[in-house]
Amino acid sequence: MPQRLEIGDERTNRLVPSVASADEISVDVTLTGEVPAWRAATGYMLFGADRSLEFAWLPSVPQGTVAIRYTVGGDEHETTGVGYHDHNWGNVGLMKVVHDWYWARGQAGPYSVIASYVTATKSYGSEPIPIFMLARDNVVIGDHPTKVTFEREGIYTDDATGKPVARETSYLYQDGDDRYAVSLTRRRDLTRSRMIDSVKGLKHIAARLARFDGAYLRFAGDIEVSHHHGGELVDTYADEALWELMYFGHAARDDIRGET
């Protein structure tokens, strides 16, 4: 189905099928940004002594609303939901610079969250790259990476991929007397895939010879956002959320352990 993207104002993206000929189905999706477009610092991660290798990422709609109108066989339907939209680009393959990352987004009460913890490959010092955006009532209130502490608890080895997985990940943001804690607790797995299994033929053989061991896992569970000021609890909100673990590299021996 051919599509075109119509850009409205800076807060609205509209994806419109230009031809409705696929089994008498047409779809009209309007994504309206609530949290303004955002980027972590410059949006670029730079690697190498000369900083010539780059990977960039921009959430153009960190949190938004979606209105959908779709027609099936002449019957028109409408529904609504929440939405997100981002872009990424670069001049180097991720597997060369990134060992693994956790990435999550969610909403709980008035809070909207984007949180990620990237670990560079050993060639680049296994450096941690925290990314964090916290908005309240659609206004960003915290996004400085040096104020973020990342924690993992309940680590076990996923038997399908052989990768270490944390049952709970937490992002702690300390800004003066204000402390925000974002916790994600896994309830079930949505995806557990070894990337090599999707590669066929000669590429599969080449990947095995290169000892490629990439995996992708996606989880469903609970997000909790709490705010303390001067040690006193201000508020706590919880909801459901999705997040992922992209693991390109080999698992370190110390990270591998059984299910607990």
Predicted regions and their residues:
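Structured soluble/peripheral alpha/beta segments that form catalytic or ligand/cofactor-binding pockets
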Residues: M1-T260
